[in-house]
Amino acid sequence: IQSTSMDQGILTEDSMNSFIRTLIQAGIWKNKVPKQAARTKDGMQTTVKKTEAGADAMASKDTRLSFQPIVSVDAELLRQQRRFSSPRVLLSENTPLEPPPLYLTEEPTVLNRTSRRKREGKSHRGEYSVCDSESRWVTDKSSAVDIRGHQVTVLGEIRMGPS
């Protein structure tokens, strides 16, 4: 799975649910095989029924299967799901060229980011203090709202000096 912002369509809730159902049926959601696993034999698909005698053997098989890591995803499944898009996830047959940004936080140079930011000076990008005022143009010049939220009268002229 590779992260990118290149989208081909709009992802709807129904299409995402359909995709998750496909993943569950393929047995790759949460690295588990569904409880009533479909077994294939000679190209025919049959559903295995549990009996009391074979329940313990089947449970140990299912437990063993549920902990097996999924090594790869079928390329055909990826081709079918190309129409699903997300700003954060792209299903791709190719492995990513570099690790996702989350892995970069484990590097030692990034761990000391807080103290480095303090030395560099304050950055207010994307941050707002509780006391920030809201600036707006006064268009009618007769009334406005001050920083405390009170309605005030705006003077048209301010005379300075002796009048």
UniProtKB/Swiss-Prot annotation:
Propeptide positions in this record?
A: 4-119
Cite the SMART domains for this sequence.
NGF (SM00140)
Question: Could you tell me which InterPro entries the record lists for this protein?
Answer: Cystine-knot_cytokine, Nerve_growth_factor-like, Nerve_growth_factor-rel, Neurotrophin-3, NTF3_N
Compartments (UniProt record): Secreted
The GO cellular component terms are:
axon; dendrite; extracellular space; synaptic vesicle
The residues that carry sugar chains are 112
Q: Which UniProt keywords apply?
A: Cleavage on pair of basic residues, Glycoprotein, Growth factor, Secreted, Signal
Predominant localisation class: secreted
Q: Name one GO molecular function term.
A: growth factor activity
Name its GO BP terms in alphabetical order: cell surface receptor protein tyrosine kinase signaling pathway; modulation of chemical synaptic transmission; negative regulation of neuron apoptotic process; nerve development; nerve growth factor signaling pathway; neuron projection morphogenesis
Q: Which residues form the signal peptide?
A: 1-3
Domain of life here?
Answer: Eukaryota
Q: Is Signal one of the keywords?
A: yes
Function of this protein?
A: Seems to promote the survival of visceral and proprioceptive sensory neurons.
Protein family (similarity comment): Belongs to the NGF-beta family.
| Name of protein | Neurotrophin-3
Q: Which organism is it from?
A: Eryx colubrinus colubrinus
Task: State which gene encodes it.
Answer: NTF3
